[in-house]
Amino acid sequence: MPEIFLWTRAAIWAAALFALFVFVPNRHPRAARWDDPTLTHDLGAVTDVWARWDSVWFLRIAEHGYDAATGAASAFYPLYPAAVAVLGRAFFGHYVLAGIVISLAASFCAFVLLYELAEERLGADGARRAVLYL
């Protein structure tokens, strides 16, 4: 089961990097408003490809807390940003990397839980397929 997790995550990462290098130079000019270059770090495209869209809000909350002036950040639950804030400080300010590590750990836990639940009803083969389809 861990091999399914590793292969699927590697495939998603490869697809994201491919999209970054192929499509970003040709993207719509207003698409940049969803990116925040102040949140990216020296780890480059390997991690920054994931700092898009709602992750910008989560990273801002992790670094600076909830801003009462905008109020828009209140739409995001606090557990994930709090975990990113703690791990980000342990990673010396690499909040994007902390978010990736937390997201990977959470998805691995979801894989394990789904496997355990599916194994009871579907057997080992069915559980592996369920995890693969996740």
PLM regions and their residue ranges:
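Residue-level signature of transmembrane alpha-helical entry/exit and packing/kink sites
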Residues: 1, 96-100
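Start-transfer (signal-anchor) and selected internal transmembrane alpha helices
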Residues: 1-38
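Hydrophobic residues within the alpha-helical transmembrane core of Major Facilitator Superfamily
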Residues: 10, 101, 132-133
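Hydrophobic membrane-targeting alpha-helices
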Residues: 13-18, 22, 86, 113, ...
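Hydrophobic transmembrane alpha-helices and immediately adjacent juxtamembrane helices
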Residues: 45-52, 56, 100, 106-107
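Short hydrophobic/aromatic helix or loop-helix immediately within or flanking a transmembrane segment
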Residues: 49-93
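Transmembrane alpha-helices of multi-pass, membrane-embedded glycan-processing enzymes
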Residues: 80, 84-88, 99-113
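Transmembrane-helix signature of polytopic, membrane-embedded enzymes
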Residues: 97, 115-134
